């Protein structure tokens, strides 16, 4: 019970409770090696892609759009950092629960059955326990209702309930500001610069395939898709908004575009349907080959090289540490010494006190000094 109490009292990590529990279960069943955790991330990505396909239950979209949209989402290179990077599991889990809430919401709007309303509520709460970005779900709920306002009664009570949960969630975070890591380390700040971050990130997200889809739809007749395009673009803005207050970059990092990528996927679903209506096998084959070549090629060349460069400082330290048997003092490194400490604990079975920060004192003996000035 002490562990649960500690988690509940941690303003940052209680908002990542689902990933902590899933990681614990993975460690318990399969060990703390990298492969099981990578497979968990990959498995959740597959679930996420199926949930995108599930948007076909919404008659406005239908499976003729949602299935190709899901295929594009599964293969799109831009957000794969959330899949490959084990530490980004909260991002993927938040997506899964938000999409589950969206699908349940659509069914509730269509049927008004209490079970669907309850499912949407539960999925939303699980999303909030996965990452703070799940708080955008009420905005998605309003967007979906607005697009179908002439067909569905105004769900005022349910949206108000979602809003109350969001308000309580925000209060629980900001009331613990003094102890919240990301509210004290300069990661986020409320300032007008978020507008540029939003615009910059949206344009980057649309490039290149969102731009190609918009150009194709404009050429072939954008009017029949106007509600889809409006909904997709508003979805993107809503999903990017929580990350637009970041201070360490002028754009939203690619792993944080995972939820926003649904908007691009819908645009590509519309574009694929337009290509199919041309009734040209050659055009369809060229379009499919171009999408696959770009996304898979980019992922396995440029992105793969990027991932390799990022992990090399840690691998280099582990090789050094294994040959020295510890303790080691980190005097300079491209990442915080805590990264090396955790890596040594997992890979080498070292105790935490065997990897020291620049000003830490070892319990016994003189530590070897390690300095890495590389910039991966």
Annotate each predicted stretch with a short phrase.
Residues 1-376:
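Polytopic membrane enzymes that build or remodel cell-surface glycoconjugates and lipids
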């Amino acid at each position: 019970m002490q562990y649960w109490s500690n988690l509940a009292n941690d303003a940052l990590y209680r908002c990542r409770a689902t990933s902590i529990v899933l990681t614990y279960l993975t460690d318990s069943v399969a060990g703390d090696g990298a492969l099981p955790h990578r497979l968990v991330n990959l498995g959740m990505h597959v679930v996420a892609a199926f949930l995108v396909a599930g948007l076909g239950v919404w008659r406005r979209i239908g499976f003729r759009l949602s299935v190709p949209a899901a295929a594009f989402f599964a293969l799109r290179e831009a957000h794969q950092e959330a899949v490959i990077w084990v530490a980004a599991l909260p991002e993927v889990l938040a997506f899964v629960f938000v999409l589950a809430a969206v699908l349940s919401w659509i069914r509730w709007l269509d049927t008004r059955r209490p079970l669907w309303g309850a499912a949407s509520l539960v999925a939303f709460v699980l999303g909030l326990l996965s990452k703070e970005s799940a708080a955008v779900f009420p905005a998605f709920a309003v967007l979906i209702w607005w697009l179908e306002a002439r067909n569905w009664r105004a769900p005022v009570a349910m949206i108000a309930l979602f809003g109350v949960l969001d308000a309580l969630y925000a209060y629980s975070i900001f009331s613990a500001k003094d102890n919240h890591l990301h509210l004290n380390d300069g990661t986020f700040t409320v300032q007008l610069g978020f507008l540029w971050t939003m615009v910059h990130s949206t344009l980057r997200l649309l490039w290149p395939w969102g731009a190609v889809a918009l150009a194709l739809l404009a050429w072939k007749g954008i009017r029949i898709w106007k509600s889809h395009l409006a909904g997709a673009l508003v979805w993107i803005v809503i999903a990017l908004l929580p990350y637009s207050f970041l201070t360490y970059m002028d754009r939203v990092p690619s792993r944080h575009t995972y939820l926003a990528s649904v908007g691009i996927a819908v645009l590509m679903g519309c574009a694929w349907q337009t290509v199919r209506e041309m009734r040209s096998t050659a055009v369809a084959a060229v379009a499919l080959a171009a999408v696959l070549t770009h996304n898979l090629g980019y992922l396995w060349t440029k992105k793969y090289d990027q991932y390799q460069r990022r992990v090399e400082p840690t691998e280099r330290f582990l090789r050094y540490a294994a040959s020295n048997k510890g303790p080691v003092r980190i005097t300079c490194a491209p990442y915080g010494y805590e990264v090396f400490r955790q890596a040594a604990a997992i890979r080498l079975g070292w105790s935490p006190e065997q990897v020291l920060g620049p000003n830490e004192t070892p319990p016994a003996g003189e530590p070897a000094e390690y300095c890495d000035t590389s910039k991966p």
